[in-house]
Amino acid sequence: MPLYIGLMSGTSLDGIDAALVRCGEGRPEWLGATGLPFSAALHDDLLALCLAREVSFAELARLETAFCERQAEAVNRLLLETGTPREAITAIGSHGQTIEHAPNATPAHTYQLDNPSLLAELTGCAVVGDLRRRDLAAGGQAAPLAPAFHAALFTASEAYRLVLNLGGIANLTRLPPSGQAAPVVGFDTGPANMLMDAWSQRHLGHPYDADGAWAASGRVDDALLARLLDDDYFSRLPPKSTGREHFHLDWLTSRLSGHESPCDVQATLAELTAASIAMGVTQCSAGVSTAYDALIPCGGGAHNADLLTRIQRHLPEIPLTPCERFGWSPDWLEAGAFAWLAHQRVAGLPGNLPDVTGARGPRVLGGLYAG
């Protein structure tokens, strides 16, 4: 079966994830992966770009080039570490770096910093890029796209199953048993690591709260939690998607009284993530007549013991099942999704699920740039 590489840089802005995946008949097979962090300067520049309302074309081109060069480095490292010849790669699926996602604006738009033409030149491989905007053009949210991949990878024969991606934003996928007419449901439940990381950076100087230890040392501020959960996004029914343009530090600080201790705020942010995920499970469970047999956490938050404990406390009836049980690492699942989406594009097959994104129908996603 053909080999693909998926490249992902999420809202955490911590670097490039690259996954080598065999795609074709049957379940996608993970063969290897590597991560390449951004330099502190590139991280800060990308964050500033995400928050900027104005930027020069020259600055945009500089950052796009630096980003693509880092992606090419990740591809080269992955090929070297896995012993894979370059000519064995059918295509690279490149997500790019989201700098704004506004599917409900007029006009709707989503922008990912990327240059598939340059990436093809730098790697010598075909590249599939611009994977979100066709769904948006068809009236969809352009996100999340991973649920179609989750369905190919995790669908069970007899039970409903949940996949939970804990990146900067939390994405939930509900998978019906194979052969059932029920649709796959997927959407963003709200912030996962994004606000916790930003708060940790501000008060501890650390890029993230390792294992959730700082959050575990604090107490949940119930009044603050209620103010946070009062945001309309949480009660909105899917399809829906969100990002840094909605959930950012200013959003948080505007809801603080000024008397909260930093560690209590961190605990409350962790509880916000867990509570909004539980709300999401309720929102997607209408019509589910059988128990879920698994909740599969993936992404960086899958290593946050405190966060997983909070999620399990909210959803005691659903067993948390490690991603590794299905032959995948939780760290590389999202990059793997973009390898699979590249396969779908090369094969001329749809990559979106209209029931997930709200698009008018299934669409072949992305453009193909020859190597």
From Swiss-Prot:
Transmembrane feature ranges: none
Pfam families documented for this protein: AnmK
One Gene Ontology molecular-function label: kinase activity
Enzyme Commission code: 2.7.1.170
Binding site for ATP: G10, T11, S12, L13, D14, G15, I16, D17
Organism: Chromohalobacter salexigens (strain ATCC BAA-138 / DSM 3043 / CIP 106854 / NCIMB 13768 / 1H11)
Gene: anmK
Stored InterPro entries: Anhydro_N_Ac-Mur_kinase (IPR005338), ATPase_NBD (IPR043129)
Top-rank taxon, per record: Bacteria
Similarity comment: Belongs to the anhydro-N-acetylmuramic acid kinase family.
Protein name as it appears in the record: Anhydro-N-acetylmuramic acid kinase
Record's function text: Catalyzes the specific phosphorylation of 1,6-anhydro-N-acetylmuramic acid (anhMurNAc) with the simultaneous cleavage of the 1,6-anhydro ring, generating MurNAc-6-P. Is required for the utilization of anhMurNAc either imported from the medium or derived from its own cell wall murein, and thus plays a role in cell wall recycling.
